Amino acid sequence: MSRKRTSPNRNVQIADQIQRDLSELIMREVKDPRIGIVTIQSVELTPDYAHAKIYFTALTGDPDKTQEALNHASGHLHNLLFKRLHIHTVPTLHFHYDQTIEKAVEMSRLIKEANSTRAKDDDEADAPAKDD
């Protein structure tokens, strides 16, 4: 007896659909004042579609409070997704603040700082020594 495996392509398609639907539902259906302007960056589904990690960024408001509010509203959002998606199992939603942008900015700052330090050291090494 063979088990039916889900296609990786189907997993990606469902994750993309959840991302689009959640973006719209959060904007139109969730009225929590702790949730400002939110962008859903990505959705990661487990192979059995039981759980979904939703990565978001918040343009306004405190990211921790936004995450708390989104996780609080996850049951309501799950029910709304159930009405939209045509799949047997709608995943339990777990919201996570996506720190990729902040980490990228910090890495860029560190690289720039290292390059300026290196350039300064090179300039000092190239300068002729002064003899008195």
From Swiss-Prot:
Broad class of where this protein is predominantly found: cytoplasm
Region: Disordered, residue numbers: 113-132
GO CC annotations, alphabetized: cytosol
Pfam families: RBFA
SUPFAM superfamilies: Ribosome-binding factor A, RbfA
Keyword terms, alphabetized: Cytoplasm, Ribosome biogenesis
The keyword Cytoplasm appears for this protein: yes
One MF term in the entry's GO annotations: ribosomal small subunit binding
Subcellular location: Cytoplasm
InterPro entries (UniProt xref): KH_dom-like_a/b, RbfA, RbfA_dom_sf
BP GO terms, sorted: maturation of SSU-rRNA
TM region positions: none
PANTHER family named among the record's database cross-references: RIBOSOME-BINDING FACTOR A, CHLOROPLASTIC-RELATED (PTHR33515:SF1)
Subunit structure: Monomer. Binds 30S ribosomal subunits, but not 50S ribosomal subunits or 70S ribosomes.
Function in brief: One of several proteins that assist in the late maturation steps of the functional core of the 30S ribosomal subunit. Associates with free 30S ribosomal subunits (but not with 30S subunits that are part of 70S ribosomes or polysomes). Required for efficient processing of 16S rRNA. May interact with the 5'-terminal helix region of 16S rRNA.
NCBIfam families xref list: rbfA (TIGR00082)
Family: Belongs to the RbfA family.
Protein name in the entry: Ribosome-binding factor A
Native species: Burkholderia ambifaria (strain MC40-6)
